[in-house]
Curated annotation (Swiss-Prot):
It is an enzyme of class 4 (lyase). PROSITE patterns: PEPCK_ATP. InterPro entries: PEP_carboxykinase_ATP, PEP_carboxykinase_C, PEP_carboxykinase_N, PEPCK_ATP_CS. The keyword Lyase applies. It comes from the Eukaryota. Its EC number is 4.1.1.49. One of its GO terms (cellular component) is cytosol. The keyword Metal-binding does not apply. Pathway: Carbohydrate biosynthesis; gluconeogenesis. ATP binds at residues 246-253. Pfam families: PEPCK_ATP. This is Phosphoenolpyruvate carboxykinase (ATP). The gene is PCK1. GO terms for molecular function: ATP binding; phosphoenolpyruvate carboxykinase (ATP) activity. It comes from Candida glabrata (strain ATCC 2001 / BCRC 20586 / JCM 3761 / NBRC 0622 / NRRL Y-65 / CBS 138) (Yeast).
Length: 544
């Protein structure tokens, strides 16, 4: 591997040619090509078309979602002692890495056109990293142009050598018989080489989430900056910052879109000593069942320059049918964040979060619509990352299933969850942040037994009470077993909804049974982390 020296923007092509052994006569290299040029090239692929709204419709082939079982971290001396090894971060040897990197290079050498995207991850100039993506599909180049932070002309001219490089040869399979491999797909990250190789999957989200994994490593280890899988907004009037954590279907995107607040970002953030900044320059929004009525900002962001992934459209009008999931439930759109009118540009806040919101969609109906958390409870529930996986979100899921994802982003974590949880608790204590657990799921009973989903208007009323400071001053009562502090009243929310013990349609005995069942799942899940948890954190969980 050549050493990383300063290289001017004009010699990027020479560097890529040298690294891959490319012939000038054979391969055209497009660097930071504009959207119109990428559209032109993408449309040469058979299925790719332009939607009636002007977005590029592209298809990722066999893989329409991430392949977490095929993610590998190279086991090497610089990162070995920090990485959280296990099912999330499976190791591969440096030899396997070398084989797969060369396999990717072999494939890229055969392409008539390669695309290079040089851009940034992280809006704070103090912490941002320079990222280079090398790929063979124009759709992938446009996707990463949208998702990374686009450099100015001057920044591009002075870009120099990247801090991290993605080699995307996803159209070409890995050799499943190579050591440490289990399939024809591999997504490998090498923290020593600061590179990533993709083989055997054309799903564009692997690039985005690979860089997220890198930031989950670099920021805490090298800068003592906390990386978070969250959305973030800031009050227009008071400048107060709120972080929203939540798994798919909990309302993270919907609730962070607020007419009284500016959007800093919808998915990936860092919390430093200076404040909060977005990692990305774009949004990767779910499109299933999308409508202008439900999500007007997302709907209107789907226009020229955006990438629609794996959607079904009318062959004559090219109008997209957002309700059609025949290819996948995981239809997506990638667009620059400045396509959202309420976005704050640059996407950072020189202020510390005043409120931390942990969102859950509890289909058991046991958890209250809102409860106030102690710092120890924040650590416990942050590490647990509980929600209910709803029917239809994954193949074979016909009824809601309880699921846990540590730090609300387990597939992307590089370090042990306790490291992130400890940093979060320390920052909350230092900056006197309030923390809340909000259940956007069922009340009155479980989903199966006829409970009702908590109305969005009530959840928004709860958020309004959090943001105006009135909820922090409310009178609270304790909910047994989970020991959650539940407000007795919230303006705009029926009081009978606030305490599920009083609201349970099947009576108190059935409620206690449901509570004990859910608490048991929490306790069982937390056994994975209890060896690194303090007694205070363990005591903050449900007590059976």
């Amino acid at each position: 591997m050549p050493s990383k020296s300063s290289v001017s923007g004009n010699s990027v092509e020479e560097r890529i040619r040298s690294e891959l052994g490319l012939s000038k006569e054979v391969t055209l290299i497009r660097r930071n090509a504009p959207a119109a040029v990428l559209y032109q090239d993408a449309l040469k692929e058979k299925k790719t078309v332009i939607s009636s709204a002007g977005a590029l419709i592209a298809y990722s082939g066999e893989k329409t979602g991430r392949s977490p079982k095929d993610k590998r971290i190279v086991e090497e001396e610089t990162s070995r002692d920090n990485v959280w090894w296990g099912p999330v971060n499976k190791p591969c040897s440096e030899r396997t890495w070398a084989i797969n990197r060369e396999r990717a290079a072999d494939y890229l050498r055969t392409r008539e056109t390669l695309y290079v995207v040089d851009a940034f991850a992280g809006w704070d100039p103090k912490y941002r990293i320079k990222v280079r993506v090398v790929c063979a599909r124009a759709y992938h180049a446009l996707f990463m142009t949208n998702m990374l932070i686009r450099p100015t002309e001057e920044e591009l001219a002075n870009f120099g050598e990247p801090d991290f490089t993605v080699w995307n040869a996803g159209q070409f399979p890995a050799n499943a018989r190579t050591q440490d491999m289990t399939s024809k797909t591999t997504i490998e990250i090498n923290f020593k080489a600061m590179e990533m190789v993709i083989l055997g999957t054309e799903y564009a989200g692997e690039m985005k989430k690979g860089i997220f994994t890198v930031m989950f490593y670099l920021m805490p280890v090298h800068h003592n900056v906390l990386t978070l899988h969250s959305s973030c907004n800031q009050g227009i009037k008071n400048g107060d910052v709120t972080l929203f954590f939540g798994l798919s279907g909990t309302g993270k995107t919907t609730l962070s879109a607020d007419p009284h607040r500016l959007l800093i970002g919808d998915d990936e953030h860092c919390w430093s000593d200076e404040g909060v900044f977005n990692i990305e320059g774009g949004c990767y929004a779910k499109c299933i069942n999308l409508s202008r009525e439900k999500e007007p900002e997302i709907f209107d962001a789907i226009r020229f320059g955006s990438v629609l992934e794996n959607v079904i459209y009318d062959s004559e009008s090219h109008e997209v049918d957002y309700d059609d999931s025949s290819i996948t439930e995981n239809t997506r759109c990638a667009y620059p964040i400045d396509f959202i009118p309420s976005a704050k540009i640059p996407c950072l806040a020189p202020a510390h979060p005043k409120n931390i919101i942990l969102l859950t969609c509890d289909a058991s109906g046991v958890l209250p619509p809102v409860s106030k958390l102690t710092p120890e409870q924040v650590m416990y529930h942050f590490i647990s990352g509980y929600t209910s996986k709803m029917a239809g979100t994954e193949q074979g899921v016909t009824e809601p299933e309880p699921t846990f994802s540590s730090c609300f982003g387990q597939p992307f974590l590089s370090l042990h969850p306790m490291r992130y949880a400890t940093m979060l608790a320390e920052k909350m204590h230092e900056h006197s942040a309030n923390a809340w657990l909000i259940n956007t799921g069922w009340t009155g009973s479980s989903y199966v037994s006829g409970g009702k989903r908590c109305a969005l208007k009530y959840t928004r009323a709860i958020l309004d009470a959090i943001h105006d400071g009135s909820l922090a001053k409310a009178e609270f009562e304790s909910l047994p077993i989970f020991n959650l502090q539940v407000p007795k009243a919230v303006e705009g929310v029926p009081s009978e909804l606030l305490n599920p013990a009083r609201n349970w349609s099947e009576g108190e005995a059935k409620y206690q049974s449901a509570v004990s069942k859910l608490a048991g799942l929490f306790v069982e899940n937390f056994k994975t982390y209890q060896d690194k948890a303090t007694s205070d954190v363990l005591a903050a969980g449900p007590q059976l």
